[in-house]
Amino acid sequence: MATKKVIVAPTKDEITNKYADYCLMHGHKPASVYKFSKENGFEEADFYKYFASFDVLERDFFTEMFNHTMETLEQSPTYNSFGGVEKLSAFYFTFFELATANRSFIVYMLDEGAFKNLQKLAPLRKEFIAYAEAILEKPINIENRRADKAQGTALREAAWMQFLSIFRFWVKDTSPGFEKTDIYIEKSVKASADLVYNTPLKSLVDLGKFIWKEKFTV
């Protein structure tokens, strides 16, 4: 008696990995979810169980990077003892270490690093801003609720712009092991922390010299 073949539905990660492989091998998205599913031996419904479209899959990829970064940080015995600026620095280093392991796919999704479609980063932005707001201490105690809210908004938006500047630097970085990105993170975090909490001049000049040397515009 013939045994009926059991088809195991793919996991979310397996679908994402197959999609990334296809895009990197062909240089473009699959023609359709139906064709992509059939070529990889699973049903179209298996794809839609996790993603409404290829664009949603790509946006989800960046959100999952954030989640994996946070999981890694939370496993560190020292992370929770860090101050806000130290936590943010640790986040950057961990995130871009993970990004390096997926560099080809990330550069592909960001249109070869042109950052033309920031909508792909919208869910990541939401997660990051909530994170920045939770860890960064406001530099000034303001009793006026509206002014205090404005201060918090400015602080988290500045953190997001810093994150984007590091992201752009990393995409363009051609140094071995992307070591210049590590330097940029250190100088950028120090300069921004000094700007918000301390005397900024020396750190800002130091960061400016580094950017000028690398011929990179933040």
Task: Set out the residue ranges of the language-model regions.
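Basic, helix-initiating cap at the start of DNA-binding domains
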Residues: M1-Y22
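An amphipathic alpha-helix adjacent to DNA-recognition modules
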Residues: K12-N17, Y48-E74, T78, S89, ...
